[in-house]
Amino acid sequence: VWYAIPDADNAACREAYGLGACWGVVAEKGRLILFGRYPFDEQWRPLVASSVLVVLLAASCLKTFWRPALIGAWVAVYAFFFALMLGGFAGLTYVETARWGGLPLTLLLASVSLVVAFPLAILLALGRQSNLPAIRTLCVIFVEFVRGVPLISVLFMASFILPLFMPQGTQIDVLVRVLIGMTLFTAAYLAEVIRGGLQALPKGQVEAAHSLGLTYWQIQRMIVLPQALRLVVPAIV
């Protein structure tokens, strides 16, 4: 890396053979790698949108910012991200989602799938331990089926197979379909991690909470989930 050749000159790359990497393609196609097929003159928009999202991701890792206002910040940043990337107002050129790519799309897919999948994973983990056979069976089938399918297959089905089963004239944007597929896939894996934390808690705590007259959701919110989630933080990270 230290002796890498950033030029696209074949002669310079041959001279440096065995000393460093030839990164001519990186220098030549850097913008394509970072921003995909987004219009060249408008690439400041994905740069700004990605920077704001990265700053929020970094802030979310600091315990100082763990307040209810952080949820509002996430909603505001996502709204800003989509508005800036799509455009179509205030003189901004409209750019369809099919032309999004590179770093902005990667950050969006990763962050949205994790943020949305986490509460869904909690519900799936609780459902797998439910006393109601119907709920428990449905959660088990969903989790085991999704975990048994590779992510690339989920993305392929969301992108190409799902539209074939849609009613004629009905169309869902490919970005939305991919987000749904990745969210469900992530939720299935997180559900198993969270279920491990739920099983690690002593049953005596739940029995004591029942004896105090607490409802099911009060027990989960105040006793079970805070401890279970704390136990599985290393596995989630």
Feature annotation, model-predicted:
Residues V1-V237:
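Transmembrane alpha-helices and adjacent helix-loop boundaries
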